[in-house]
Amino acid sequence: MSIFAFSLCKSLSLFFSLFTLLFLYIISTEETIIFALIERSQYRKNYAIYDPKVHKLRNVYGAPQSFLEYMLLETEKLHSKVRRYTSPEEHPFYASYLPTPILPELSYPQQILLTGKSAVDVNSEVMRWYVEKIIDRLCKAGDDEQHGSSVLCDIAAMQALSRRIHYGKFVAESKFLKDPHTYTEYVKQGNVTAIVDLLTNVEVERRVLRRAFVKASTYGQDITGTTEGYKIDPMLIADIYRDMIIPLTKDVEVRYLFHRVGVAPPTPDTYYSRCRGPLDAFDDPKALEELQVPPVIANAKKNL
């Protein structure tokens, strides 16, 4: 179900009934992200992919670029020709360098977001997090020379993360419509703390972290003969949600709300620390029992 089922809504009440579909769609992205990371984990870290000095590639300005940057741009160029990035839910990493689609533009029935796509974009942070933080914990050390396969997995994973995080704009719009007066006042006051607190639902975030852990535990099982283990550390997935996806999504929501009201957003360093997901998501034994979290949680919690 695409989020643009929402563009068919004719009234505010209908919008909020369809918002349930947005919630379900966001949940479905969890599988996409987990499977993409599982695919990347089968290869070594292959740091040569991310080093602009290794493959001697140049960007449009003649400066060195990494193999990842080169392949990502070329992939987006191809996808742009078939109008992938005309969809408001898609955010290219290299928007300025993409060609015009060769297919006729699609007509979306109704505009949901009230800011342009380029107004809120955190893809640079998505790439930085992925390369500097995720790969280090996701993959085994070393270089297996599978650079092509690895970088294709990288692109799939980063695009999935980007899509999930930028859905924060749609979430922010729905929350704004529920209480436009309060959000408008907080934005005009520059009260970012109050905005972040209003956007945050700690119990929902706890459920997100637990659900991500359980899905990673289920989909990432690696059972060979008498040996049982995981293709990917389930707690890594929970950590990615807590430390990257949740705070970057809130960052997107905050920026969107400021642009929505017509006020320049503050720099993220003034509020980003408040956006992190909860640290106590795995402290409630009853909640874990209901989710049927495997016993490995006892050891995995040490990574928090």
Segments the model singles out, each with a brief description of its role:
Residues 1-304:
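Extended amphipathic alpha-helical regions
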